[in-house]
Amino acid sequence: MEDEFFGEKSFQHYCAEFIRHSQQIGDGWEWRTAKECSDGYMCKTQFRIKNEASTPHVGTPASVLTCLPTEENLELPMDDSEVTRPAAVAEVIKHEYHVLYSCSYQVPVLYFRASFLDGRPLALEDIWEGVHECYKPRLLQGPWDTITQQEHPILGQPFFVLHPCKTNEFMTAVLKNSQKINRNVNYITSWLSLVGPVVGLNLPLSYAKATSQSE
């Protein structure tokens, strides 16, 4: 594991390990390669129900936002008490997460976007409002510098991105700590576990267990 340099080959290696475990547990991550070049990226798509009677925001706790494996399962259960009053307005949000390698910063970068099923995208303000409350204090000093909209370097489409300027700093601390306790880590797993929850992307604990068992 490189302490000072995280090259693209290392990025692809750790992504491959990550995706192997994802396939074992059916978590939906896959690797895609651009047709015009050899560059590739890791990606996942998931659907959530947004209940507007409970919250107007995206990225709220799992009790409000329910992850859906497919587009078909979009109906909300209705009990007798709900029949006697107007049904809550529910909308389905499609979330796309892409993990790419940044040659400039030499670290992985999380690109993401969210849209309704009719294709209407969520605005940057909606994305920021959907950031979980426990992460907002850390980002409030510069939310628009932390979550920005950029062109996807491979797809050429607008995506939101978590700026990678601090990635090397906090990942160096993570890697040094893992060395002290002689623990094997997958760079992508450790990094995504830290940055993913900021935008509603959570990894099952089995990823960390799989990394430890691969020593």
Curated annotation (Swiss-Prot):
The keyword DNA repair appears for this protein = no
Q: Where in the cell is it found?
A: Cytoplasm
Q: One of this protein's Pfam families, by short name? A: Autophagy_act_C
Q: Name one GO molecular function term.
A: Atg12 conjugating enzyme activity
InterPro entries in the record, alphabetically? Atg3/Atg10
List the EC numbers from the record. Answer: 2.3.2.-
| Active-site residue numbers | C165
Top-rank taxon: Eukaryota
Keywords linked to the UniProt accession: Autophagy, Cytoplasm, Protein transport, Transferase, Transport, Ubl conjugation pathway
Can you supply one Gene Ontology CC term for this chain's record?
cytosol
GO BP term (any one): protein transport
Q: What is its main location?
A: cytoplasm
Quaternary structure, from the entry: Interacts with MAP1LC3A. By interacting with MAP1LC3A, it plays a role in the conjugation of ATG12 to ATG5. Also able to directly interact either with ATG5 or ATG7.
Q: What does this protein do?
A: E2-like enzyme involved in autophagy. Acts as an E2-like enzyme that catalyzes the conjugation of ATG12 to ATG5. ATG12 conjugation to ATG5 is required for autophagy. Likely serves as an ATG5-recognition molecule. Not involved in ATG12 conjugation to ATG3. Plays a role in adenovirus-mediated cell lysis.
Family, according to the entry, reads as follows:
Belongs to the ATG10 family.
The protein's name: Ubiquitin-like-conjugating enzyme ATG10
Q: What organism is recorded for this protein? A: Mus musculus
